[in-house]
UniProtKB/Swiss-Prot annotation:
Cellular component GO terms, alphabetical: cytoplasm; Holliday junction helicase complex; Holliday junction resolvase complex
Function: The RuvA-RuvB-RuvC complex processes Holliday junction (HJ) DNA during genetic recombination and DNA repair, while the RuvA-RuvB complex plays an important role in the rescue of blocked DNA replication forks via replication fork reversal (RFR). RuvA specifically binds to HJ cruciform DNA, conferring on it an open structure. The RuvB hexamer acts as an ATP-dependent pump, pulling dsDNA into and through the RuvAB complex. HJ branch migration allows RuvC to scan DNA until it finds its consensus sequence, where it cleaves and resolves the cruciform DNA.
Region (Domain II): 65-143
Protein name: Holliday junction branch migration complex subunit RuvA
Source organism of this protein record: Acetivibrio thermocellus (strain ATCC 27405 / DSM 1237 / JCM 9322 / NBRC 103400 / NCIMB 10682 / NRRL B-4536 / VPI 7372) (Clostridium thermocellum)
Domain of life: Bacteria
Length: 202
């Protein structure tokens, strides 16, 4: 219903914002990361929103970035994960860190979020891993570097490059870093860790 709301920030606490737009005050539930980055009371803000409707509950959720909103929508698509749990995840880890945790089966990182136990974390990974990998691999395949690797190399290499792209590296940067460390006998986590070490060097 609402893609985003732009207006004056009237109030914020650790759970929600109130944004006034055209004389209407919208209560928008959000994450701690959005709360900390949204700005000061009285400033004009833009919040990407999602209208959550279930039986007798209608709530508006919103985030500072489209990336946060995308992860929120992915999370609430998981069986047993509601909007409050999704917000809890986004309060604990960034969207890129979340995507990397899912791709690399990192249950420990997901359970840092309040209310997310091991079983729920495993379910999140099970239900979202292919979706996130497909999104990143599609972007990668459309790049010149991706076309070369996906035609000739293993899926492990492509997945490692995909994980680096989740962290914000370009296809060219990710491909170069992975190619420099890749060996067929490595697992995904080792490839990613070694590639990140290479990227961290000046």
């Amino acid at each position: 219903m609402f893609a985003y709301i732009r207006g004056r920030l009237e109030y914020k606490n650790n759970d929600f914002l109130i944004v006034e737009s055209n004389g209407v005050g919208y209560r928008i539930f959000t994450s701690l990361s959005t709360i900390s980055g949204i700005g000061e009371i009285g400033q004009e803000v833009k919040v990407y929103t999602y209208l959550y409707v279930r039986e007798d509950v209608i709530s508006l959720y919103g985030f500072l970035t489209q990336e946060e909103l995308n992860v929120f929508e992915l999370l609430i698509s998981v069986s047993g994960v509601g909007p409050k749990a999704a917000v809890s995840v986004l309060s604990a880890i960034s969207p890129s860190r979340f995507s990397l945790a899912v791709i690399t089966d990192d249950v420990k990182t997901l359970t840092k979020a309040q209310g997310i136990g091991k079983k729920i974390a495993q379910r999140i990974i099970l239900e979202l891993k292919d979706k996130i990998k497909k999104e990143q691999l599609t972007e990668y395949a459309q790049s010149e570097e991706g076309g070369k690797v996906l035609d000739t190399d293993s899926s492990k290499m492509a997945e490692a490059v995909s994980a680096l792209m989740v962290l914000g590296y370009s296809p060219a940067e990710a491909n170069k870093a992975v190619s420099a460390v890749y060996r067929e006998d490595m697992d995904i986590e080792t490839i990613i860790k070694n590639a990140l070490k290479g990227l961290a060097r000046p």
